[in-house]
Amino acid sequence: MADPEKILKVSVVTPDGIVYSHNATMVAMRAIDGERTIMYDHLPIVTPLAIGEVRVKRTHEMNDRVDHIAVNGGYIEFSNNEATIIADSAERARNIDVERAQSAKKRAEQHMQEAKEKHNEREMLEAEIALRRAVNRLHVRENYGK
C-alpha cells in the first residue's frame, strides 16, 4: 500500500468538465520547454504544456498502473501535492475514438496541402497544429488504449 503521505491528487479539466481525477504517485508530461515529472512534495509550479501525452502513475493499491491521457496543450498547476491540468481538450486513451481521430488527421493533411498551394502561412500553421493533435490522439490510443 502506498504511504498516504506520498500521494498526489491529479486532475485533468477541460471546458466540458473533469476528464480525469485520481490519486497517483507521479505525473509526467511534455511542457513547452521539455519533459517534466512531478512527484510528492515537488516545488509549486505553473507551466504551459505542449500537445502530448500525460502519464499518471497510480498508487500501489492500483498496482502502480499508468494511465495515459492525450492533452492538446494547456497548463499544469502543482501545489500542496495537487496537480491540475487545464486544457482545451483532453481524452483518456481508452476513450479516444480512432475513426474520429483518423478523420481529423486526414482533414488536417488536406488543409495543409490547400494552405501550401495558397501560400497561406496562417492556415498552414493552423493545419499543422490540428495534425499534431490528431497524431497525438492516435498515438496515445494505439499505444495505451487497452
From Swiss-Prot:
Record's bilayer topology term: Peripheral membrane protein
Compartments it resides in: Cell membrane
Keywords associated with the record: ATP synthesis, Cell membrane, CF(1), Hydrogen ion transport, Ion transport, Membrane, Transport
GO cellular component: a single term: plasma membrane
Major localization class: membrane
Region ranges (Disordered): 102-122
A GO term, aspect molecular function: proton-transporting ATP synthase activity, rotational mechanism
InterPro entries tied to this protein: ATP_F1_dsu/esu_C_sf, ATP_synth_F1_dsu/esu, ATP_synth_F1_dsu/esu_N, ATP_synth_F1_esu_C, ATPsynth_dsu/esu_N
Annotated family: Belongs to the ATPase epsilon chain family.
Job of this protein: Produces ATP from ADP in the presence of a proton gradient across the membrane.
Family matches, as HAMAP family: ATP_synth_epsil_bac
Quaternary structure annotation from Swiss-Prot or TrEMBL: F-type ATPases have 2 components, CF(1) - the catalytic core - and CF(0) - the membrane proton channel. CF(1) has five subunits: alpha(3), beta(3), gamma(1), delta(1), epsilon(1). CF(0) has three main subunits: a, b and c.
Stated name of the protein: ATP synthase epsilon chain
Native source species: Lactobacillus gasseri (strain ATCC 33323 / DSM 20243 / BCRC 14619 / CIP 102991 / JCM 1131 / KCTC 3163 / NCIMB 11718 / NCTC 13722 / AM63)
Gene that specifies this protein: atpC
